[in-house]
Amino acid sequence: VYKYYMKILAVQNRMGIGDTVIFLPFIKTISEKYNVPINLLVRDNSKAGQYLDETSYINQILILERNNNFNGRHDGLIGAVNLIKDLKDKNFDKIFIFNSSLRFNLIAKFAGIKEIYQYPLFKKKNQHIINTAKKFIEDSINTKIFDDPKIHIDKNTIENTIFKFKIKREDTNIILGIGGSGPTKRIPAKT
């Protein structure tokens, strides 16, 4: 049972479903450390709202409104001000930023978030997506407890899907396969 006395935000601004899934064990570890569900700031194309809405350690999914045309609500200087306002309204106590961005660091400070945990600034070159996140969490909250990524789906959704797609339980069925495209995004068979 979670106690809702602390509000924590995790920022995962990489694109895609696979990128978000890769970070789930680290977000879960933060949740377990502080015994609160985590708010998650992600890009819209992560589709996190479509597959993390049943995940017990995720409280709210906030969308980072940026796009390729650089005219999203959170793009540019005006966008940074909008994001500061959005985060300030949520009154977060802590933020975990899974990147080396000075922009997000300053946004967190101006939003009044007191405890900011982040990858080392200006050290983006050659970062391994998994190893960097693992070291970041180990160093930030002094814990080495990590699980494999898991997506929680309620039983009714599973049963409705089985019925809708006429899935036979005696057959081998692959329902969802998520992966990354680069060598630093591959999860080893044993983690």
What is the predicted role of each segment?
Residues 1-191:
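Catalytic machinery of carbohydrate-active enzymes
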